[in-house]
């Protein structure tokens, strides 16, 4: 029996339609701008995000770094949440590669940042300080329960950013999870953003790739930044073909992942010794804790892996599970049975 892999939605396999599209993709040299399949994907991504242009890049980390490099010069400062993926999991690339200073401010439990706190973090025009140039938001917010940030909040933050002369970048790795959860077009969530990135290779199930979207002028500069990072690809239409299928066929089904995540959270919360918060689960990310401290997260994760269920141990007593294609409701019930068995319930 195949293991149930809940470590991340990055483990999604490409669909048969994706494999067929990749095998049949029309290609050219994308560095010369001659790959027609890449162009179609970029046009589609721009349309779905309501932006004028888009750019295919290799990964979400590259997408975020490209956007930071375009918005900020060396010695400039970006403001971002203290729980953001960029701050925790992208190797400090903004500083290491771009010379960009990160200034963290607290994320609230729902992934938002108080606009008052944002405004207070903006530097005065003084030679002692870096220049505040960029505000980064994350939607959905990975470390904050996969919470979606709604359009009302995004628009309110945009007003603050405008007053403070900050550009806005949205790390939208799971932007379409947010759109599905909130029942609105993805474009509505990033209408006021200067740039947005999203992943094709998470819940949308493409094997590789992320998109950077913004104005035509922004994407022209992003293309230069991609090149210096080694991200210029040649016959990239083979990758882009899967991305087209992802955007046209895999968005609506994200709702299934959200249902499975809620069921998983409810089941975990009902197991003696564990705690989860089903009410906090709005998309496909579930955090749960060993409430009675009978074992550690690492030990439980190892026991589950031996029984065919893979999850991530994050902290001494805290774990994460992420639902995704092609997992089913039956897989969730099997997972819960394995957890009960491993805990002796």
Features from the language model and the residues they span:
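Conserved PLP-enzyme active-site core in the AAT-like
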Residues: 1-279, 283-307, 312-327, 335-344
